[in-house]
Amino acid sequence: MKAFTYERVNTPAEAALSAQRVPGAKFIAGGTNLLDLMKLEIETPTHLIDVNGLGLDKIEVTDAGGLRIGALVRNTDLVAHERVRRDYAVLSRALLAGASGQLRNQATTAGNLLQRTRCPYFYDTNQPCNKRLPGSGCAALEGFSRQHAVVGVSEACIATHPSDMAVAMRLLDAVVETITPEGKTRSITLADFYHPPGKTPHIETALLPGELIVAVTLPPPLGGKHIYRKVRDRASYTFALVSVAAIIQPDGSGRVALGGVAHKPWRIEAADAQLSQGAQAVYDALFASAHPTAENTFKLLLAKRTLASVLAEARAQA
C-alpha cells in the first residue's frame, strides 16, 4: 500500500469539494473493496476523504411512498429495515445472497454500487487490463474467461459487475442522487449509471470527478412476487455465475434483471414484455446481442434455465 493523506469532512459539499481539490483523492466509508485494492496497489489514492460522519445513514419514506436510502446505510441495516423486507423483498434477498454478515455490517449502499470487478486479470498487476491500465489490453479475451460477461462486452473488456444489490435495485428502477464539487445535485437512473466498456472500460460510471453519491431512491412498491435466484460455484459467499431478480404480478406480467452476465445489471425492458410468452421469449430478448467466449458459453444455457425456474416458481405461487 502506498502512502496517502487522510481527512474527515462534515458535509457532502465539503467532501465533493475536497475530492476535486486534491488530485488522486478517493472517498472512503466501509472500505471493504477499496482497502483490498489499495493493498494490491491497484488503487493508489494520494488522499482519503472519510465520509462516515456525513449523516447519510438514514432510510426515509419519500412523498411518493417510496424509500430514500442514504449512501452510508450499511447493508445489514438495509436488509433488516421493515419496509425493505415487506415491500422490496427482492432487494433484501439479493443483499443476503451477496456477502457474509461481517461484510454486510461494514459495506455501504453507495460502496456496493461502486465496487470494482472481480476479474482475476484486473487483480493481477502482471497482466494487461484496460480497466486497471487503459490501453494495455484485456488478458481475459484469450485467457480464463469462465466467469466473464456474455453480453454488453467489447474488444477492450469482458468483465462483469459483481454486485447482487445492484441487480435488485436496477429491477426496482432505483435512482442515484449525487452532489458535485460545485454544490449542484444530480439524479441518475441506475439504468444510466453504469457505462458500457466500449473503448474506455476504465470509465465505469456516469459520476463526474469529485461527485459524491448521497442517496439512492426507490419508487413506490410494485407488489407482486419477488424472487432472487443466484447460481454460483459454492453455496455461499461467492459471486454469481448467473443471477435472476424478478418481480412477477398475479396476471403474469412483471420484470426481470440478471447479474453475472454483463458489465452492469442486465435488464432489457423489451424482455419484460415477453414474460407472457415464457422463458424462451424472455431469454431471446435479453441475449439477442450475446457474444460469449468458448469458456463461458455455458452461461447462456444457465441463464435460460434459471429464468425458466424463476418463472415456474412465480406461477406455482401465484
UniProtKB/Swiss-Prot annotation:
Catalytic activity: an aldehyde + A + H2O = a carboxylate + AH2 + H(+)
Binding positions (FAD): K26, F27, I28, A29, G30, G31, T32, N33, L34, T108, D164, I213, K230
Domain of life: Bacteria
Sites where the protein binds [4Fe-4S] cluster: C119, C129, C138, C157
Disulfide cross-links: none
A molecular function GO annotation: metal ion binding
Matches recorded under Pfam families: FAD_binding_5
Every FAD-binding PCMH-type domain range: 1-223
Any one cellular-component term (Gene Ontology): periplasmic space
Flavoprotein among keywords: yes
Record EC number: 1.2.99.6
InterPro entries (alphabetical): CO_DH_flav_C, CO_DH_flav_C_dom_sf, Diverse_Substr_Oxidored, FAD-bd_PCMH, FAD-bd_PCMH-like_sf, FAD-bd_PCMH_sub1, FAD-bd_PCMH_sub2, Mopterin_DH_FAD-bd
PANTHER family referenced in this protein's UniProt entry, alphabetically: ALDEHYDE OXIDOREDUCTASE FAD-BINDING SUBUNIT PAOB (PTHR42659:SF5), XANTHINE DEHYDROGENASE SUBUNIT C-RELATED (PTHR42659)
Protein role: Oxidizes aldehydes to the corresponding carboxylic acids with a preference for aromatic aldehydes. It might play a role in the detoxification of aldehydes to avoid cell damage.
Assembly behavior: Heterotrimer composed of PaoA, PaoB and PaoC.
Entry protein name: Aldehyde oxidoreductase FAD-binding subunit PaoB
Organism: Escherichia coli O157:H7
